[in-house]
Regions:
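Acidic/polar loop patches that form or flank catalytic/metal-binding clefts of enzymes
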Residues: 109-110, 131-135
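Sequence context of c-type cytochrome heme-c attachment sites
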Residues: 44
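Low-complexity, flexible helical/coil segments
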Residues: 105, 136-137
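Right-handed parallel beta-helix
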Residues: 1-7, 11-33, 47-77, 85-87, ...
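Extracytoplasmic/periplasmic beta-strand context in beta-sandwich domains
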Residues: 38-39, 84, 108-109
Length: 138
């Protein structure tokens, strides 16, 4: 089990200040129409202690201070909804999404959900128009 610390991540311009660097990946054809609510590259909480309702947001129990850069992410297909290309999920804080290319079909290019101090810089998004043939949940 990886233990993440909040000691790093104070300086987004210094890659050595991040706990995890996700770099130079080619992520493609993910989801393939069999699942929902996912990301090509996703950061998120490990459990209920990271639900944003406690002081645990920036403690080692949460996936924080991740630098996602220089990745190519393309073509994600959900079953019903929510194929997110770059996805910072619940309470994932202090992350930097930089110099990524997002291309093709999917739902949303970049999502920051309920975290603190997440940044997006210099990302290129090229989306093809795709018809939405699914019903929206109500």
């Amino acid at each position: 089990m990886m233990v993440l610390s909040d000691e790093k991540g104070k300086n987004h311009d210094d890659p050595d200040e991040f706990v995890i660097n996700v770099e130079y990946n080619y992520v493609h054809d993910f989801g393939v129409g069999i699942t929902n609510d996912f990301g090509g590259i996703k950061t998120g909480s490990k459990g209920p202690q990271c639900d944003g309702g406690t002081e645990a947001w920036l403690e080692e129990r949460c996936y924080s201070y991740i630098r996602v850069y220089n990745n190519l992410v393309r073509d994600g297909w959900p079953y019903l909804c929510c194929a997110n290309f770059l996805y910072s999920d619940v309470s994932s804080s202090g992350n930097l999404f930089q110099n990524n290319i997002v291309h093709g079909s999917g739902s949303v290019a970049l999502v920051h959900h309920c975290g603190l101090d997440n940044e997006s810089r210099n990302n290129i998004v090229h989306r093809e128009a795709q018809p939405d043939n699914h019903q929206v949940w109500s």
